[in-house]
Amino acid sequence: LKVNNNSRFTNLYSSNEVIRIPIAHAEGNYYVDKKILKSLKDNDQIIFSYCSENGDITKKSNPNGSLLNIAGVTNKEGNVVGLMPHPERVSEKVFNNIDGIRFFKSIINYHNY
């Protein structure tokens, strides 16, 4: 996933950082109409995008046909998030990947200001 770190859910990631978080959504994908998509982009609400290991956003790196490779979005206020990846599945060292822990720590970090 490529991260947009401009949210209370992703503020501890680097800008455009590429992370590995598993998905488990069968045939689900993200779709909205053009008006909502424009609003999401204009308001910087897309916080996760499916990408290659190098951070390239391509059709090949999109596992489910999600519109614009979208994997996670926030509402306009930035206090609600919806995402397909499961950061809780990579938030402890026992999983051999802790890319997800910063998702949760970002929320704490935001509220400790």
Model-derived regions, located:
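Amide-donor transfer/coupling interface in amidating biosynthetic enzymes
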Residues: 1-113
